[in-house]
Amino acid sequence: MRDNKVSPKPFFFASPERREVFPAKTKEKITRKESREHLARFNLACELVKVIRHFFPELLSLLKRVEDPRHQSYIIYSNHVLLMTRILSSIFYINSMRSTSGEFNDETVIENIGVLCGEELRELPYWETINNYLKRFSSDELQKVVCRLVYRLIRSRAFEDARLRGKYWQIIIDGTQLYRSRKDLGEHSLFCRKKKGTEEEYTEYYYYVLEAKVVLHEKIQVSILTEFIENEKREVDKQDCEQEGAKRLMERLKEEFPMLQICICGDSLYASEGFFKECRRKKWKYILRYKEGSIPSINQEYQVLKRREKNRVEEPEGVYDYVTGVDYRGESINVIEYESAKEKKKFLL
């Protein structure tokens, strides 16, 4: 184990189908510590297979059903082998496909991946083969697989305790910047002017992506949908933005999970009349981190009402105050203010 990350080769050191735990062809004595480490590697390989087969028994069949863009007469590796190899490289924290070819170039690794894929493999696909395949591969196909796997997790009832009030699944919407460069990243990239009006003015280009993640446990958040924030072309009057991307993401979420009881969680960026109406139209609940200044009228009314209603409660973990039914253009907003005793921080929701 390196830097608290499982090293890929030891993780797949022994096949779960094998009876022997230790190498048969060795004349060297191993220490007790090495014995424990080797046994741990064997157990980890077995546990990975168990997790996949228990929680995601459909994974292999779903990967087999994705549309293959290649000419079927000229392929050597099935699409599910290519995809499974790439998925495993991510699980093992391998940062590049070139490194994957080196790390996975081992008879036992090849055998184990073959077990997962249901095929007898002599070799694994080279990194260039996988990259060329992914360039032609539609990301929408993989998105369908992700949604299906998440749907199974939700239906399994293994994470029922994660529901708010025993009913609503928390879906966190959050944005992440992927790249930033002074070099033009393409016509779809976003851009901003830095040091505007000075001799040092320059343009910075970047990509931004929104993720919708379902909370299954306080330490487990699983991505459901991905939405890129990007311009249709370089010359635009108004650039794409996170709020518009969130609208598209919410529409897709409703299409994929029309009956799911959802509580959307996000930051103050989404606090707007349009967002509130969208949630009401979709029959969703929402919890937003509120910052003073995003909608001043809400904070002003809250400050007046909390002095009048006196709902303040003090507990060892912290102090909280709340006001229900704050009106904002016909929307009834509940505001909660919480101050953690441990962190000495205030939060407005």
Give the ranges of each region predicted by the language model.
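An anionic, glycine-rich sequence signature occurring as long contiguous blocks
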Residues: K285-L349
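Domain-level cores of phosphate- or acyl-group-handling catalytic modules
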Residues: V236-I298
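Charged, often Cys/His-bearing segments associated with DNA-binding zinc-finger transcription factors
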Residues: M1-P57
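DNA-recognition alpha helix
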Residues: M97-G118
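Basic, short loop/linker segments at the boundary and entry of helix-turn-helix/winged-helix-like folds
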Residues: I52-M84, E119, E128-N131
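Electropositive, glycine- and tryptophan-enriched low-complexity nucleic-acid-binding patches
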Residues: K194-Q261
